[in-house]
Amino acid sequence: MKKTLLASSLAVGLGIVAGNAGHEAHASEADLNKASLAQMAQSNDQTLNQKPIEAGAYNYTFDYEGFTYHFESDGTHFAWNYHATGANGANMSAQAPATNNVEPSAVQANQVQSQEVEAPQNAQTQQPQASTSNNSQVTATPTESKASEGSSVNVNAHLKQIAQRESGGNIHAVNPTSGAAGKYQFLQSTWDSVAPAKYKGVSPANAPESVQDAAAVKLYNTGGAGHWVTA
């Protein structure tokens, strides 16, 4: 799910897609249209999620009107994000095969948030979306299951990463803007579709960690990470 609150201020999304390898560029050498890029980032312009801002490798960071913007590409994958200048917003990255289409990531205000876009190996039918945000880098694919701390439910490595970037592992986290809640930042409608009868209609943040873990595993098994990211 999207948009977990971790600190004050604003940080927003990134888009990652496969591109073409090229030269390495640096912000100090670039003649960037900062105003245009800032406006595109603030409005979550889909162009930023569909293609890099230029061919080849580049790594640009600049401040503009109270926000810090970052655009990067290794020539194959590209990413972008922004946050209020001085806020502790982390740069995000992910990998997506060239054959996949990546839809724009969501944009949310209020507190330090950032967002990533991941694409599964094979195209899947879009499942109910959950809001997402995080301050950690995620590139791994789930490889093993292991019981999470404070719970006897086996949670795979990918779900643990999702929980970490959604809420920092806080089972009581609540996003007052989107209403997403709990360790995995479930929206209420999504939670009610996978929660035990006893907890339907109850905020995910009020459910025990083991119940939240079990619901997340159930949701993940029906559609993978697509429940938490737009991919």
From Swiss-Prot:
It is an enzyme of class 3 (hydrolase). This is Probable transglycosylase SceD. Induction: Positively regulated by sigma B factor. Is able to cleave peptidoglycan and affects clumping and separation of bacterial cells. Residues 1-27 form the signal peptide. It is found in: Secreted. InterPro entries: Lysozyme-like_dom_sf, RPF. Residues 93-152 are annotated as: Disordered. Residues 93-116, 138-152 have a biased composition (Polar residues). One of its GO terms (molecular function) is hydrolase activity, acting on glycosyl bonds. Its EC number is 3.2.-.-. Belongs to the transglycosylase family. SceD subfamily. Residues 119-137 have a biased composition (Low complexity). GO terms for cellular component: extracellular region. Its main location: secreted. It comes from the Bacteria. The keyword Zinc-finger does not apply.
